[in-house]
Amino acid sequence: MEHTYQYSWIIPFIPLPVPILLGVGLLLFPTATKNLRRMWTFLSIFLLSIVMIFALYLSIQQIILSCIHQNVWSWTINNEFSFEFGYFIDPLTSIMSILITTVGILVLIYSDNYMSHDQGYLRFFAYMGFFNTSMLGLVTSSNLIQVYFFWELVGMCSYLLIGFWFTRPIAANACQKAFVTNRVGDFGLLLGILGLYWITGSFEFQDLFEIFNNLILNNRVNFLFLTLCAFLLFVGPIAKSAQFPLHVWLPDAMEGPTPISALIHAATMVAAGIFLVARLLPLFIVIPSIMYIISLIGIITVLLGATLALAQKDIKRGLAYSTMSQLGYMMLALGMGSYRSALFHLITHAYSKALLFLGSGSIIHSMEAIVGYSPDKSQNMILMGGLTKHVPITKTAFLVGTLSLCGIPPLACFWSKDEILNDSLLFSPIFAIIACSTAGLTAFYMFRIYLLTFEGHLNTYFINYSGKKSSSFYSISLWGKEEEKKLNRNFGLVPLLTMNNTKRASFFYKKTYKISNNVRNQTFITVENFGLNTRTFYYPQESDNTILFPMLVLLLFTLFIGAIGIPFNQEGIDFDILSKLFTPSINLLHKNSQSFVDWYEFLRNATFSVSIAFFGIFIAYCLYKPFYSSLLNLTLLNSFQKWNSKRIRWEKLINFVYNWSYNRGYIDAFFKTSLIESIRRLAKLTNFFDKRIIDGITNGVGITSFFVGEVTKYIGGSRVSSYLFLYLSYVLIFLTILFFFYFEKF
């Protein structure tokens, strides 16, 4: 066992050779590196699988022995200061390592097909490998300096992947927005780390916690300053985990490739903030005001994320706000001291949300055959509908993920969310009411996404025949740059069409190639009753096996991962594996833990939350069930208008909620007006002051000296008599002025 821990330091570095070799290969041997690109994918998956096996073994050992292992090396810089670095293996490290590697492997397999036609394929896998390395380094760090180093690397990889298609202005802006927003959090985290070191003199977690607790117990430190340092530490996770008010970057991060959205939202960047709060919880828990702030930020984020998801039309943005809300649940649980519940929900949500994002990627992939390679269209749920019969496997996987996030038993998120709701009732009735209400909203907006996407009829062609003038068609090149394409009107909106029944137009290549008999025999539909020209339409198809396989594995995780934390005992049998794993931490932190004694108590506590979820699903079904006659019924507002045309006040309320949600709560607009515009005005004022005042004075002195010199030169004419005349004139003027001043005094 000790021998195993001795080599645990290598965990973060196992995936690192792939990005290094890819970088060197693309610089020195670009052709050979590109020709072997599938080999790099296999190597990435293989190395990450080794880390997964290692993490599983460590977790099993910790369940058996309930131990924490730390190994530190010291680097002495001088006699007064030495830097210590090492690795820290505890249950939190093990569970996070398993989460990162399992989701990471499945996303890599998925990406091999999803990104196969992209020119940045190798660059993508290099970033992914470095991303996994950074996150593994973060969770195994033994001190705050290492945490901050890998924290920044995780952020850097996220920015690179969010702006992966950097030639698209909207993706570049999203990358910049994520960078600037997280700078605020990272600066706060750095100040908090420095403040804690100034107080305790240590960066090591175990030493830091012990010294910190002793200082508070003995009242040997300014408590206000201590609270400020703890709050600054928390500012970092606020930004990284998209908590209010630094959440604004998360929806825009959907401009990156869909596999990255799955990884960021499930197991890497946003999970990093939750991990850090969990790691530092022994420090936060001794400051009640900080714990209350954490729970308050969490409950605000829970409600805000749910309300902002209500009216989103982009499927990925809807899931992004869902992630924001679920992260709020985790932060709420940590603020209440419910350590186990928070991490349990982190695990269950990670697999469910990864399944949903990979499912959305499969949907987007199939929609691109209809609307072209344009995110504004392929991700727009208003253009979807009726996909059940076209992508049945994707539909099943997406439905399971949706039900899990809604909190329907026995799926994964039911077990963890129910614990958080019960703990919130013990913590604060107001928080419990908000948390339970948001559970209903979660079920509502998740089923809204499902119904708009899979139920009814495919709406793409009907919108084009709605009588409205269609906007110009845009496609995206392999690097993501928007380019306007002129379409032959006989082709409609189908970029993948048959040509003479023997050739097919490919989006990714200019050349044409023969299509197979299977494709030639596929069902097409001809619409003749719109008073327009007869057109042939192409319908979505199920994705390839390499896209479906990770989804099916995640589906199994979503079905069964909740079993590790079943919170009740029956006839002496303890089903709660998660509590056994977290035993050392729970003994210190989890004050609200109350294991359910039997089935009756468990059912009594679960019935209420499940009832709320089913109520949200019922409302969503009533409002968004398919209305084939008009696409206008697909919006929340118009559905209420159909049912409540005479209730003007109710319509105004619904209209307000819809506008609030669709416009992101006007928070982005507020930041733009109050911060961005103010900074721009300040920059313009500074520019004016610098150019007109500072430069004006400097240039004015220079110009004045120049003109005086020129005048003197021309008056003097280089003759001694002229110089004497000027000299005597100056003396006379000086004496005259002196004479007048002298006589004025008398």
UniProtKB/Swiss-Prot annotation:
Cell location: Plastid, Chloroplast thylakoid membrane
Topological type in the membrane: Multi-pass membrane protein
GO terms of molecular function: NADH dehydrogenase (ubiquinone) activity; quinone binding
Gene Ontology CC entries for this record: chloroplast thylakoid membrane
One GO-annotated biological process of the protein: ATP synthesis coupled electron transport
Superkingdom to which the source organism belongs: Eukaryota
Principal place of residence: plastid
Pfam families for the chain: Proton_antipo_C, Proton_antipo_M, Proton_antipo_N
Top-level class of the enzyme under EC nomenclature: translocase
Reaction it catalyzes: a plastoquinone + NADH + (n+1) H(+)(in) = a plastoquinol + NAD(+) + n H(+)(out); a plastoquinone + NADPH + (n+1) H(+)(in) = a plastoquinol + NADP(+) + n H(+)(out)
Residue ranges that the Swiss-Prot or TrEMBL entry lists as coiled coil: none
Keywords, comma-separated and alphabetical: Chloroplast, Membrane, NAD, NADP, Plastid, Plastoquinone, Quinone, Thylakoid, Translocase, Transmembrane, Transmembrane helix, Transport
EC number: 7.1.1.-
Residue intervals passing through the bilayer: 9-29, 40-60, 89-109, 125-145, 147-167, 185-205, 221-241, 258-278, 280-300, 327-347, 354-374, 396-416, 425-445, 547-567, 608-628, 723-743
Similarity comment: family membership: Belongs to the complex I subunit 5 family.
Function: NDH shuttles electrons from NAD(P)H:plastoquinone, via FMN and iron-sulfur (Fe-S) centers, to quinones in the photosynthetic chain and possibly in a chloroplast respiratory chain. The immediate electron acceptor for the enzyme in this species is believed to be plastoquinone. Couples the redox reaction to proton translocation, and thus conserves the redox energy in a proton gradient.
Subunit structure: NDH is composed of at least 16 different subunits, 5 of which are encoded in the nucleus.
Protein name as catalogued: NAD(P)H-quinone oxidoreductase subunit 5, chloroplastic
